[in-house]
């Protein structure tokens, strides 16, 4: 009997680009086992944080396990042992012998045992980013070695002692925290990181091309201020002006510049401080923009001007400043330039983007502190679910406060004490919750927009401090969304609905600065029944194409996709709430399409090409093609962009709509290549197509397949409204040549250009998403298809989607597609509540009428 592939030995390693991580493999093994045994030398707090949702699942589902670990090299911290001891379903023992160094994971299910052994300890880096080699094997194929591993585990277990509170207390007395490895830089010279090197090179090239302004887009915590200092040092302007919106930021920026540039005088221009004669001046916008202050300087006083948080530059104060001064070079910096209240920031900088690094790239290049995000269910109080309309009393209910405290204690933090930020919806809530937390033994304060600069700075200093009585948490609404620097923040708590992905990233970013006192940041998001929960996966994934399937996939498999050691974990209820929000969201509407189109146009300074939408991470162009009021990119431009002046005949528009709406998904390459060959004026297309498909795609064209292609491109396949909509669209004729009508339309060069543009996009989409065909079919595993797609891709002569239900047999092609609603709605009728189920990984029972 042939061995099932899933039980064959395989290598388990980390490569997020291949969607492979050790952590994901372990999650699957944990959640599908009846019991488990681990023998792992090194277990870090970060490793438990990376798998917390998984360990909680094991506890909640009463899945028992055994863990053997040690105190070898003093790596395992007392805090980690305390966390393990909380899991009543796990029996933990300490191996007291010398040289304990295994990394073995054993999982039992019924009469099967799966094992993973290799190099991975339970640390966040070993689970996600390190170069690790682990071998997976199963008792189904490797029974002898499995028995030997179990025998060795039993020996270790007998030689180990139980983990108890008393043992932890004794261990804590003698435990010495390992010192972090530090690279000693003899010259003490600070050098640019990866992002900064690329950006500096780009800025230099812009100036060589006589550009006098540029925009830098860089995620919070990636070192924008240091980058600016490096560039100013390279340019060496006689005078420089650095503009920010808060005094504390100006002071911090000046300190940064002083570490990089030693031979220039630097001063502050804010409030009562007016250091006019310094080479480099750091100013607050509130002071420098005033006529009586800016006129203290000549218009060409500064050779180089930098504006931080430049997305604010639409305000009159910034505009007056920019219009007054005439520097040789102007640099704008922002993590979120899109938030500019309809003001075109890109135009302000002549569309010169020096460099762009978003959160996901910064994580990939290890520029930020890893985070462990936990989406957990907000509390239901007296049958009232927290939602967008919840009143104040519900938000500050004693039971909710106790629930929040219980959760933030459970999820914890990295380091010796908590340095936390808690974001809430309104000022009154911040003040009341701070008061209630203080009554329960915490040291907290609430900061609102009314707080003075001094009050804010004192609160931030206290939160950073490790002295007794320092703040544990600061409650705030939005004043900390940007422009603050508290590197020690190790816990971010979100007690508010996510209203936008930009604000979400800004608040998340408060904890992402690296600091020696933390290994990771804990992010706890209390998810209520909020309408815009769909912004959570958009923000965390960085995928702004608004494709619902991609958003759902990220919620389910985000850990596989996200770069670096960070993790994203949802409990089941919060996951369902996000799925519900995705389902309900109107992400295909014209309003969103128009908004994202003009956002991209503003960024590029021109009408975007079709390929630009994916290239620059904008909305999925399929939303344009599948929108029934558009169906083509031309139609979008014609309706909404006054700069677009192309006019097509009604027939030309119909051809464009057909190709865009019906073929651009790239689900089958044959029709696309047929059209391309037809445009090249090939006659007898059948022969050319067979050759092209064989040579380029290794696909053999059968007679039935070619018949299907002809039917589709001559509208013989179509049925219902689709047939009427495109009844005049005929790409090829019955003699395998380009149709006379299509040939004539192609004499219009602009029409031809747009058809080819759609074809190029569609062919690339096929290559990216649909070229891994299943056996000799045109279908791919794990892809989404409509009933009409199935009819076409199975080469049926007609579109029978309107009469297709549980299954249908097609005699002409001898195919029988079966459709199963595996997850059924609770309110369906008893007559259709079929017990569809998997018997084993290779056998599925489906029931139909």
Where are these regions (language model features)?
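A short beta-strand element within the Helicase C-terminal
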Residues: 116-117, 473-476, 480-497, 503-506, ...
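Walker A/P-loop
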Residues: 208-232
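Post-DEXD/H (motif II) to motif III coupling segment of the RecA-like Helicase ATP-binding lobe
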Residues: 311-372
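Conserved segment of the helicase C-terminal RecA-like domain
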Residues: 501-506, 510-540
């Amino acid at each position: 009997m042939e061995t099932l592939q899933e039980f064959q030995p395989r290598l388990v390693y980390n490569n997020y680009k291949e969607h492979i991580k050790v952590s994901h493999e372990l999650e699957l093994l944990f959640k599908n086992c009846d019991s488990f045994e681990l023998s792992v030398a090194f277990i870090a707090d970060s490793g438990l944080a990376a798998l917390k949702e998984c360990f909680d699942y094991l506890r909640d589902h009463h899945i028992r396990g055994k863990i053997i670990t040690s105190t070898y090299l003093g790596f395992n911290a007392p805090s980690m042992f305390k966390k393990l001891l909380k899991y009543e379903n796990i029996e933990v023992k300490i191996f007291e012998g010398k040289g304990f160094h295994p990394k073995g994971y054993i999982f039992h299910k019924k009469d099967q045992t799966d094992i993973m052994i290799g190099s991975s300890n339970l640390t966040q880096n070993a689970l996600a980013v390190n170069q690790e080699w682990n071998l997976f094997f199963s008792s189904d194929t490797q029974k002898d070695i499995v028995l030997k591993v179990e025998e060795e585990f039993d020996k270790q277990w007998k030689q180990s002692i139980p983990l108890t509170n008393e043992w932890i207390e004794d261990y804590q007395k003698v435990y010495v925290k390992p010192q972090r490895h530090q690279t000693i830089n003899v010259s003490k010279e600070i050098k640019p990181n990866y992002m900064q090197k690329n950006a500096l090179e780009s800025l230099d090239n812009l100036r060589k091309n006589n550009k006098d302004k540029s925009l830098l887009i860089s995620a919070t915590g990636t070192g924008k201020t240091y980058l600016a200092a490096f560039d100013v040092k390279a340019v060496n302007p006689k005078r420089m002006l650095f503009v920010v919106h808060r005094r504390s930021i100006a002071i911090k920026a000046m300190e940064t510049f002083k570490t990089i540039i030693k031979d220039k005088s630097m001063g502050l221009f804010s409030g009562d401080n007016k250091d006019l004669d310094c080479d480099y001046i750091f100013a607050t916008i509130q002071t420098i923009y005033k006529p009586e202050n800016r006129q203290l300087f000549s218009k060409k006083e500064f050779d180089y001007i930098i504006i931080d948080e430049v997305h604010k530059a639409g305000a009159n104060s910034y505009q007056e400043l920019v219009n007054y001064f005439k520097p040789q070079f102007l640099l704008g910096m922002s993590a979120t330039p899109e938030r500019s209240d309809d003001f075109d920031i890109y135009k302000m900088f002549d569309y010169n983007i020096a460099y762009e690094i978003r959160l996901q790239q910064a994580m990939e290049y290890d520029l930020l502190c890893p985070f462990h995000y936990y989406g957990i269910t907000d509390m239901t109080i007296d049958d009232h679910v927290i939602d967008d309309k919840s009143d104040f009393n519900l938000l500050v209910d004693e039971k909710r406060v106790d629930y929040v405290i219980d959760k933030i204690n459970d999820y914890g933090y990295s380091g010796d004490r908590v340095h936390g930020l808690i974001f809430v919806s309104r000022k009154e809530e911040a003040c009341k919750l701070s008061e209630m937390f203080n009554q329960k033994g915490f040291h907290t304060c609430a900061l609102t927009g009314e707080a003075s600069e001094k009050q804010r700075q004192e609160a931030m200093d206290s939160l950073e401090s490790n002295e007794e009585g320092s703040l544990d948490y600061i409650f705030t609404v939005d004043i900390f969304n940007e422009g603050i620097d508290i590197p020690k923040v190790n816990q971010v708590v979100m007690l508010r609905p996510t209203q936008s992905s930009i604000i979400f990233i800004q608040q998340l970013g408060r904890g992402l600065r690296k600091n020696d006192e933390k290994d990771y940041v804990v992010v706890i998001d209390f998810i209520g029944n909020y309408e815009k929960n769909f912004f959570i996966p958009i923000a965390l994934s960085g995928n702004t194409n608004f494709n619902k399937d991609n958003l759902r996939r990220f919620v389910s498999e985000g850990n596989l996709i996200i770069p670096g050691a960070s993790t994203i974990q949802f409990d089941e209820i919060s996951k369902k709430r996000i799925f519900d929000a995705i389902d309900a969201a109107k992400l295909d509407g014209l309003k969103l399409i128009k908004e994202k189109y003009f956002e991209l146009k503003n960024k590029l300074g021109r009408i975007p090409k079709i390929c630009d939408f994916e290239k620059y991470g904008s909305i999925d162009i399929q939303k344009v093609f599948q929108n029934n009021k558009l169906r083509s990119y031309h139609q979008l431009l014609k309706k909404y962009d006054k700069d677009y002046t192309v006019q097509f005949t009604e027939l030309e528009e119909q051809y464009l709509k057909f190709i865009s709406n019906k073929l651009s998904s790239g689900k089958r390459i044959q029709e696309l290549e047929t059209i391309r060959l037809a445009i090249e004026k090939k006659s007898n297309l059948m022969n050319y197509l067979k050759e092209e498909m064989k040579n380029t795609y290794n696909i053999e064209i059968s007679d039935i397949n070619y018949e299907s292609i002809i039917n589709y491109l001559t509208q013989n396949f179509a049925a219902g409204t689709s047939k009427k909509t495109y009844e005049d669209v005929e790409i090829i004729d019955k003699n395998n040549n380009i149709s006379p009508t299509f040939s004539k339309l192609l004499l219009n060069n602009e029409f031809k250009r747009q058809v080819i543009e759609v074809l190029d996009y569609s062919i690339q989409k096929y290559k990216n998403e649909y070229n891994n065909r299943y056996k000799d079919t045109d279908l791919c595993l794990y892809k989404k298809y409509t009933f009409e797609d199935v009819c076409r891709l199975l080469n049926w002569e007609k579109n029978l989607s309107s009469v297709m239900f549980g299954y249908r047999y097609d005699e002409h092609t001898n195919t029988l597609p079966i459709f199963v609603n595996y997850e059924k709605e609770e309110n369906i009728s008893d007559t259709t509540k079929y017990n569809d189920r998997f018997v084993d990984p290779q056998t599925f029972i489906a029931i139909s009428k």
